[in-house]
From Swiss-Prot:
Domain remark in the UniProt entry: The last Arg residue of the ACP-binding site is essential for the weak association between ACP/AcpP and FabH.
Full protein name: Beta-ketoacyl-[acyl-carrier-protein] synthase III
Primary gene name: fabH
Species whose genome carries this gene: Acaryochloris marina (strain MBIC 11017)
CDD domains (alphabetical): KAS_III
HAMAP family xrefs: FabH
């Protein structure tokens, strides 16, 4: 039976990060770098790293519980759990592990992989289920443990990444607080940023071989990714604003994927968004992929800076290459 269409609102957020952190001075003991070199080029001062006993599912579950508590929603009332990640504990996915950990026994759970764009892509996916009336309460988790796939001898990339998780609760609402969005992908640029599988032939019979191997560390063309981000992100934000019938001046907060402070500054400058409206916590977390947006959102909300009704322009961008933006109002 066709359900009645409805709006949606973001009603709670939460986050989690491993206890262990590694600052730039500590990193300089591992590779030839320095705090000044890293901070001046990336804005990063420290990053949280998952230890041997930390799991992505554990971090995701903590973030989820914090978001549910803020939204005043019971886990048993959830209809759907979406996990945006590229680094699950289980290659088949970790959303069901989070479902079990928080006791969301009635919720459907599955992973969504869109790298650093994953949280925005996940938000729009969740919105379709709510807007069509299929589900009313959705938990969206963005979590990554990129330290598993970093080459800790490569000073160009190992300085960038950290581990963490963030989550939001999206609920059916009479007034639709998701005002507009735009999503894009360009597979022709895949080689700019990837974690490639590398296998070797293993003979099964005289005529049949299979490939067995593992994934290689993160490979990134930093200059191309920077050029891509500073050109495409302002475009997609403006496209989402146009769909929302809003202008840049209507934005209360610009919430970008925390990839590099230089990218945040360049995008804000192109959009003519003042620095005081740009949310940034990259100094303490680094690039946590799908977790950056909800991590930064949660910190800003809990500091009391984001108020009910504030308009937030969020944009994720990264491997694929993929990029997207969502314009939404904070409900709580």
């Amino acid at each position: 039976m066709q359900q009645m269409a409805t709006g949606l609102a973001v009603t709670g957020c939460g986050s989690a990060a491993p206890e262990t952190s590694l600052d730039n001075h500590g990193l300089s003991q591992i590779v030839d770098t320095s705090d000044e070199w890293i901070a001046s080029r990336t804005g990063i001062r420290s990053r949280h790293l998952a230890g041997p006993d930390d799991t992505l599912a554990k971090l995701g579950a903590i973030a989820a519980q914090n978001a549910l508590e803020m939204a005043q929603v019971e886990a048993t009332d959830l209809d759907l759990i979406l996990l945006a990640t590229s680094t699950p504990d289980d290659l088949f996915g970790s959303a069901c592990q989070i479902q079990a950990a928080i006791g969301a026994k009635h919720a459907v759970a599955f992973d969504l992989t869109a790298a650093c764009s994953g949280f925005v892509f996940g938000m729009i996916t969740a919105a379709q289920f709510i807007r069509t009336g299929v589900y009313r309460n959705v938990l969206l988790v963005g979590a990554d443990v990129l330290s598993r796939w970093v080459d800790w001898t490569d000073r160009r990339s190992c300085v960038l990444f950290g581990d963490g998780a963030g989550a939001v609760v999206l609920q059916a609402n009479d007034t639709d607080r998701l005002l507009g969005f735009a999503l894009h992908s360009d597979g022709c640029l895949h080689d700019c940023l990837n974690v490639q599988y590398q296998g070797e032939a293993r003979p099964l019979t005289g005529e049949i071989n299979v490939s067995q191997g593992t994934y290689q560390p993160i490979s990134m063309n930093g200059k191309e990714v920077y050029r891509f981000a500073v050109n495409r992100v302002p475009e997609v934000v403006e496209k989402a604003l146009f769909q929302s019938d809003l202008k840049t001046d209507d934005i209360d907060w610009l919430l970008l994927h925390q990839a590099n402070q230089r990218i945040l500054d360049a995008v804000a400058k192109r959009l003519k968004v003042p620095a005081e409206k740009v949310i940034s916590n990259i100094a303490n977390y680094g690039n946590t992929s799908a977790a950056t947006i909800p991590l930064a959102l949660d910190a800003t909300v809990r500091k009391g800076h984001i108020k009910p009704g504030d308009t937030i322009a969020a944009s994720g961008f990264g491997a694929g290459l993929s990029w997207g933006a969502a314009i939404f109002q904070w409900q709580r």
